[in-house]
C-alpha cells in the first residue's frame, strides 16, 4: 500500500512517499503549511501523481505518552486533514524515532 508521510511543522510540512511495496519512505519536498488551501492543493497533486492510498502523520508525543503543545497542533491538523482527503489518515507515534534512526 503506497503511503504518504507528513512531518507537521508550524511553517512547513515535510513530505515523504513510500515505495510501491509500502516498505521504505523517501523524502520528497517541503510544502508551506499556510495558506492551508495551497498546502492541500499541492498535497492532492502529489497524492494523484503517486497513487497514494493512505497518509501517515508523525505524532510528537512526550516520553510518558502525553500530548504536549505540538502534539495538540498535530491532532487538530489530522482532524482537518481527514475531512479534506479521500484516503485514510493515521498518526504514528514518533517517540524514540530519532534515536532509532541514529543507530
Named regions from a protein language model:
Residues 2-3, 11-103:
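Phosphate- and other anionic-substrate recognition elements at nucleic-acid/protein interfaces
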Residues 7:
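Conserved catalytic-loop position in the HRD/HxD motif
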Amino acid at each position: 500500500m503506497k503511503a504518504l508521510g507528513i512531518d507537521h511543522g508550524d511553517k512547513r510540512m515535510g513530505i515523504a512517499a513510500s515505495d510501491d511495496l509500502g516498505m521504505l519512505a523517501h523524502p520528497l519536498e517541503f510544502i508551506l503549511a499556510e495558506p492551508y488551501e495551497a498546502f492541500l492543493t499541492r498535497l492532492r497533486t502529489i497524492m494523484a501523481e503517486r497513487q497514494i492510498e493512505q497518509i501517515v502523520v508523525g505524532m510528537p508525543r512526550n516520553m510518558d505518552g502525553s500530548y504536549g503543545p505540538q502534539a495538540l497542533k498535530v491532532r487538530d491538523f489530522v482532524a482537518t486533514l481527514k475531512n479534506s482527503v479521500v484516503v485514510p489518515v493515521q498518526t504514528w507515534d514518533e517517540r524514540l524515532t530519532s534515536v532509532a534512526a541514529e543507530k
